[in-house]
Amino acid sequence: MRLTVVGSINLDFVATTPRLPRAGETVTGATLARHPGGKGANQALAAHRLGASVYMVGRVGDDPVAEEALRTLRMEGVNLDYCNPLAGHSTGLAMIVVDDKGENQIVVAPGANAAFDAEH
């Protein structure tokens, strides 16, 4: 099966903490990890791992973060021919805080994802 996924590509920063902070509050986190993410990239990777031949269509910036955001997709064999860097833009970033119950808060700086258009 061949599949094309159109969507966001980000680098995620994930912090775990016993509980989520309230407005204006600082809490101490247990861990901080960074890894490739984005709704589109996650779907492309999942479909590929289930056996599909996947083409990812998305935007990354022309910054050092772009390669890190694409690394897992590339290493696992997702086709990235339609994920060329966009000059003058940063790659999307997500800040994710997860508590002990699995609840989360997410802030996304979309970067090049926001510049995606029909001509891409």
Where do the protein language model's features map onto the residues?
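Glycine-rich phosphate/adenosyl-contacting loop at the front of the ribokinase-like
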Residues: 1-59, 64-75
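Glycine-centered small-residue hotspots that permit tight backbone geometry or close packing
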Residues: 7, 40, 92-94, 111
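Short C-terminal domain-edge/linker segments immediately following a structured domain
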Residues: 33-40, 87-89, 113-115
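Residue-level detector of anion-binding/catalytic polar loops
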Residues: 53, 79, 103
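A glycine-rich helix N-cap at a beta->alpha junction
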Residues: 72-88
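Conserved phosphate-binding/catalytic loop of the ribokinase/pfkB sugar-kinase fold
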Residues: 82-86, 96-120
